[in-house]
A protein has these predicted regions:
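Glycine-rich phosphate-binding loop and adjacent beta-alpha segment
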Residues: 190, 245-308, 345-351
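Short amphipathic alpha-helix with an adjacent loop that forms part of the alpha/beta core around
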Residues: 222-232
Length: 351
């Protein structure tokens, strides 16, 4: 079969590999749709110290069950499923409390298991054991269902923020994740949602797709002055950094109201050190939260919101590419007007 494989030394190669076969407790799916995540983009551009090669990457996935191994799974061939990629051990302190995404022995599809940028993928037995395999209603299009995991990650990021009608929300980053955070903030009843970026094309597209938000191009406008005027000099109550720029963490401290809640959602380079103002946190009584991945329960909630139409997430998909043209998709994502791309089965390639 065709697969996109991380071979080490910052190299990803489209190559033919053996089709996986089911083992005890596992299942094989034919990938119907996989989505390119920011993590995949970083691996494409810079490699990854987390991935032990060779490894098929890609972790946002839905597919059709082809084969089921012996021992435990109730799935049947022909069923549609999505797979939650972050798989806990089920036994550690955090797993026992439902926080499987911060498991002490977390293993992730596309990093520790072969992932979704392939024609077929094996679902690990531990994914079944942890409830990470979710049956899909055939009425939900795969192109929407595959976005469940990133929506669940945003739900996790906002789970500690308690956004409500009295809150102004500032989001750094107008990429796909920033736009999804904005959708959730609007749905939570925030009185105003401000999306800031330095990419004018992305901001324009975000504004076209969500008329309930405000946008600020901070390369041309004074974001501090905008926030001051918008909040009567009080500052914003909720800030989400949905971009890999550590300086936004420092700016968040400056633009926050007293007792604001801040989610550091996007990972940053340089080991993430040296961006926080400890005195600002102390004197303004700021609550600063991290966010990593999502649990199976959060994925089920995300899928419910997609299925019900509460969150219109598929509108942020700019298009799709067949697997045999996946590198074109990665290059296309450099365009400011491209927010999210899907990878579909290859054209004219026999399994």
């Amino acid at each position: 079969m065709l697969a996109y494989v991380y071979t080490g030394e910052q190299r990803l190669v489209l190559q033919r590999v053996p089709k996986p076969v089911p083992h005890e407790g596992t299942a094989i799916i034919r990938v119907l749709a996989a989505a390119i995540c920011g993590t995949d983009i970083r691996t494409y551009r810079y490699g990854s110290a987390r991935i032990r090669p060779p490894r098929v990457i890609g972790h946002e996935v839905c597919g059709l069950v082809e084969e089921v191994g012996a021992g435990g799974s109730e799935l049947r061939a022909g069923e549609l499923v999505l797979v939650v990629p972050a798989i806990g051990c089920g036994h550690c302190y955090w797993c026992r409390r439902g926080h499987t995404n911060v498991c002490a022995r977390l293993r992730t599809i596309g990093f520790d298991y072969d992932g979704a940028f392939a024609e077929y993928m094996e679902i690990p037995a531990q994914a079944f054991a942890m409830g990470n395999v979710i049956r899909l209603d055939p009425a939900i299009p795969p192109d929407a269902a595959v976005l469940t995991e990133p929506l669940a990650c945003c739900l996790n990021g906002q789970s500690s923020l308690q956004i409500g009608a009295e809150d102004s929300v500032l989001i750094f980053g107008a990429g796909f994740i920033g736009c999804v955070h904005a959708e959730l903030a609007v749905a939570s009843g925030a009185k105003r949602v401000i999306l800031a970026d330095v990419a004018g094309g992305r901001l324009a597209l975000a504004r076209e797709l969500n008329r309930k938000i405000e946008t600020v191009d901070s390369s041309k406008e004074d974001l501090g002055a905008y926030v001051k005027e918008a909040t009567g000099a009080m500052g914003v109550e909720v800030i989400i950094t949905a971009c890999p720029v550590g300086e936004t963490h420092a700016t968040a401290m400056e633009l926050s109201a007293a007792r604001a809640r801040i989610c550091l959602f996007g990972g940053v380079p340089q080991n993430g050190k040296g961006f926080l103002d400890s005195n600002a946190i102390h004197y303004k009584e700021l609550a600063v939260f991290g966010s990593h991945a999502s649990s199976a329960a959060q994925n089920r909630e995300a899928l419910r919101r997609i299925a019900s139409g509460e969150i219109e997430i598929a509108k942020y998909v700019s298009g799709s590419y067949p697997l045999n043209r996946i590198e074109e998709a990665f290059e296309a994502l450099k365009n400011e007007r491209v927010l999210k791309l899907l990878v579909k089965p290859p054209e004219g390639v026999e399994p």
